[in-house]
Amino acid sequence: MRSTMLCLSLIVLLGQEPPKESWSYRSFASDFERVADSTSGLPMTERVRVFRSTFDKLYPSLYAHPDQSRLDGRIEKALTYFPSIRSTYDQVEPKFPEALANAMKEFRGAFPDFTPQMPIYLIHSLGTRDGGTDQVAGRKVMLFGADEIAQFHWDESLQPFIVHELFHIEHSRHFADCDQLWCSLWQEGLATYTASVLTPDASDHQLTLDVPHPIRRDADAHWGSALCWMAEHFDSTNPSEISAGFTGGPKPATYSGDRRLAPLPSRFGYYIGLRVAAQAAKARSLSELDRLDNQAARPVAARALAELMQASHLSCRLPAKQGSITYYAPRSP
């Protein structure tokens, strides 16, 4: 494999007229592999040093972290476990550009004016992400993690996963990241819903609703508790609660109102978000939902969640119709 800079205009990869603006893609996946190979016989401290030196030259700040010791630990772990994912990892880089182009073509069928206003990079994420936007050297970029893709998306789920991430880029033009839990519910729910709409008969695997375990099954088994927990924490800015719902962090302990304790699965917020988005889509088109800003989206999300709760005849408190919205509270990377 080799690192490449590709200008992926539609005339080359999609067989259509060239767009007014092109979009850029670059892979650093093989650069990680070269570091892993060239340092395999060295002490780990030296391997980490070579990694840092190499990527500081290739793209300063690509692997920045305020806690240097924590970053070194991630580098060490990534180098140590790389052999276990290598066979699949090696398939990601050659497969990814075509999957990205196909996903872009599919996505523009629903959002014809879409053009990413940020570069797209494929990297070894050191186990931190399969995809997502981030700030690198003061610039907003889309990062795809080849290591996580190798574990979760190397099969038929790759293109729907890319569609999910492209929606986040599109949605960010209208909806800003905000601190409340409902913001993640809305963002991830709409992205998952978009992937489901653009992937007919999509499986839960294609929608990443099976990581780290089957989310739909476990959430449906405790559906009332899941909805009530989400309503209770709708405006929460507590990082541990948001992590519990969306990032595979500690499971929400329980919902312990007037009913028995019911464990909720990690990342269940993605599934609840999908159901909330589908409920909201009964009254508005996907394009209309995408274009709602934060102030307009909050009551729509709250109403959709409330309708799901009422349909299930739940007695717990509905989400508040109004609530404050704050932005950009610092979180631990």
What are these regions (language model features)?
Residues 55, 227-332:
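Pan-zinc metallopeptidase signature
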Residues 49-55, 119-129, 212-215, 294-298:
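Acidic helix-start/capping segments at beta-turn-to-alpha-helix junctions
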Residues 7-20:
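Bacterial Sec-dependent signal peptides at the C-terminal "C-region" and cleavage site
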Residues 74-213:
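Acidic/His-rich structured neighborhood in mature extracellular/periplasmic domains
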Residues 90-101, 220, 270, 291, ...:
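Generic detection of long, well-ordered alpha-helical segments
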Residues 1-7:
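Sec-dependent signal peptide recognition
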Residues 18-39, 110, 181-231, 308-314:
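Post-HExxH zinc-binding segment in Zn-dependent metallohydrolases
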Residues 17-76:
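N-terminal mature-domain "stem" immediately C-terminal to a signal peptide or N-terminal signal-anchor/transmembrane
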